[in-house]
UniProtKB/Swiss-Prot annotation:
This is Lipoprotein LpqB. It comes from the Bacteria. It comes from Rhodococcus opacus (strain B4). The gene is lpqB. The lineage of its organism: Bacteria, Bacillati, Actinomycetota, Actinomycetes, Mycobacteriales. Keywords: Cell membrane, Lipoprotein, Membrane, Palmitate, Signal. Its main location: membrane.
Length: 597
């Protein structure tokens, strides 16, 4: 899938008829926009389209003036110059707009006191997020309350007292900022990893913003799990231009882009490929088209590409690629593994097709290996579940047992299987490629188990850098961090899908920066959530019968199992035709969809 088609896919998010609290926005759409947070508020000095509130309207009543002020506050240009026009001259000079940036919705402006020339209002709202330096969005949940005072000056109301920091109405924030992903490298240097940011400003300033943020590096929580070839003193020399050197409309329409880097250390061909992949996928994801002419101190960055790079030159690291297209859909049907085609289902050869006692299973990314959780059939207090591992068309061996084992999930290189055992222990099963021998090691999941009692779902992202989990019915994302000595830990878990409204039952990765969640609800049983928690989209519910008990996904298609069948949703269908369709051979039976991962 191309960045353009992915963007189009996301623009078709569906508004639920009976919306979740978090899905309801002033504009009526069931989500925040696509991506993480904006650039550090109060630090952006550039030309921008500007707020639609150019200056305070004459004769405005104080409560309406406050609402105009919140609207103007979403324009960060020149330290929120548009918003400062609503302040008295003295307060305008003192206001610390960079102290914080709080995103709220359902803003109430409540009168507290009012005289002929003084007025005080209480501002109450729902807090939904915080903007942090570097454009990082942190999802939050709670109430927000503050007081703002105004006074009459020259016949016009102006704000005379307000808290430090910026208050951003979510609907206005979404009109001003866009979510764009920076791309860093996984530890093995085999793919790029998204780090969503929110940026504002004109499209012709987007390339400069994104490359600057890329050079600054990943957010702190992600830093231990990724690499950045643009670190170590790399900077941009001169302005970023179109490929032919023109300085107007850079990054807009055709004409490509040229970036002259300086401070680039000596690199071999592979390192240059990784460097270019970070730059190209960051720009391509932001709808900045190539060719991408990359220079180092005025000379071609790589002599193989003197006229510029294209996305085809770094296609092996495409963050939108998926292995499921080549491996195909499988399913767990009545306890057995079957392959699924347009004409029906076929039991797979070997143990996994013959067994009748499997509860969940996972295919490796290349489709050659299988891990499954099987029912032991033994009475309590004996372990009820066994984790079976084997080749696709061969036998299987039990590698561990437990009272409960989550659906397994494979590491991207197919070398390890992850699962949660008994709700509170996360393990990795290592498999030697040559011999097939397995060993079980624990993962440090203390940061996750501190959040709740029971882990019921664990899914690794396709780049292997993040883990999506369900803990006590809530959705969390953690960073997969390799510690000194080779051990792994799940670090910095953060709640996403805040305000989900009903317990999460199942989840899976759709793209590298979105997950699909099935929840215990009949009105909107399936939603799509951004990794930074900034966005939640209601997926269509037509044809589904609650509860939806399982979900599996690729970049192009979601599959779910409800109480009577397995359904698929094609992300490329037109919005009016986008609904769940039954998968042949998986209707009227107990079945769960299975894609690689």
């Amino acid at each position: 899938m191309t960045p353009g088609s992915r963007s189009a896919m996301r623009s078709r998010s569906v508004c639920g008829a009976i919306a979740l609290a978090v899905l309801v926005t002033v504009s009526g759409c069931a989500s925040l926009p696509d991506s993480s947070t904006p650039q550090a508020i109060g630090t952006i000095n550039r030309d921008s389209p500007g707020s639609s509130v150019a200056a305070p309207a004459p004769g405005r009543e104080p409560d309406l003036l406050l609402r105009d002020f919140f609207k103007a506050s979403t324009d960060p240009t020149d330290r929120h110059l548009a918003a400062r026009q609503f302040l008295t001259p003295g307060v305008s000079g003192r206001w610390d707009d960079a102290a914080s940036a709080t995103i709220v919705d359902k803003v109430d402006v409540l009168p507290e006191t009012r005289s002929a020339d003084q007025a005080t209002y209480t501002i109450r709202a729902n807090k939904v997020g915080q903007l942090e330096p570097g454009g990082l969005y942190v999802a939050e949940e709670g109430s927000f309350e503050t007081r703002i005072s105004l006074e009459l000056q020259g016949g016009e109301w102006r704000i005379s007292e307000l808290p430090a920091g910026v208050i951003l109405d979510r609907a206005q924030f979404l009109n001003t900022y866009q979510r764009k992903s920076l791309y860093f490298l996984d530890p093995a240097g085999t793919t790029v990893v998204p780090d969503p940011r929110w940026v504002s400003g004109a499209q012709d300033q987007m390339a400069s913003q994104l490359i600057g943020l890329l050079i600054d590096g990943p957010k702190a929580a992600l830093a231990p799990a990724v690499r950045n070839e643009l670190g170590d003193g790399v900077s941009v020399r001169g302005p970023i231009t179109k490929a032919d050197g023109r300085t107007a409309q850079v990054g807009v329409g055709l004409g490509g882009i040229r970036i002259d880097f300086t401070g680039v250390p000596p690199m071999d061909a592979q390192q240059k490929q990784l460097f270019a992949a970070q730059v190209i996928w960051t720009l391509a994801n932001a709808e900045i088209s190539g060719p991408y002419v990359l220079l180092a101190d005025g000379e071609p960055f790589d002599e193989r590409f003197p006229n510029g790079w294209t996305t085809a030159d770094v296609a092996s690291m495409n963050p939108f690629a998926t292995s499921s297209a080549t491996v195909g859909l499988h399913a767990l049907r009545e306890g057995s593994m079957v392959s699924v085609t347009e004409t029906g289902v076929t039991p797979v050869p070997g143990y996994f097709g013959a067994a009748r006692n499997m509860r969940s299973l996972a295919l490796s990314q290349d489709g050659k290996l299988v891990a499954a959780v099987a029912d032991t059939g033994r009475p309590a207090p004996e372990p009820a579940s066994s984790l079976m591992v084997g080749a696709y068309e061969d036998g299987a061996a039990s590698v561990l047992e437990g009272g409960a084992i989550t659906r397994p999930t494979w590491a991207p290189d197919n070398s390890a299987i992850w699962a949660a055992v008994n709700g509170n222990t996360v393990i990795r099963v290592l498999r030697e490629p040559g011999t097939g021998r397995t060993s079980v090691v624990n993962v440090d999941a203390g940061a996750v188990t501190a959040l709740g009692a029971t882990i019921t779902e664990l899914r690794l992202s396709r780049d292997g850098v993040r883990a999506a989990l369900i803990v006590d019915g809530k959705v969390y994302l953690a960073i997969v961090t390799q510690m000194p000595g080779g051990a792994y830990a799940l670090t910095n878990p953060r709640a996403v899908a805040i305000g989900l409204g009903s317990p999460a039952l199942s989840l899976d990765w759709s793209t590298s920066d979105t997950i699909v969640v099935a929840r215990a609800a009949s009105d909107i049983p399936v939603v799509q959530v951004a990794v930074d928690g900034s966005r939640m989209d209601a997926l269509p519910s037509r044809n589904l019968t609650a509860p939806v008990v399982a979900v599996d996904a690729s970049t192009t298609t979601e599959f779910v199992a409800d109480s009577r069948a397995v359904f698929q949703l094609n992300n490329n269908d037109p919005a009016g035709d986008r609904y769940w369709r039954e998968v042949p051979g998986l209707t009227g039976v107990k079945a769960i969809p299975v894609l690689p991962g």
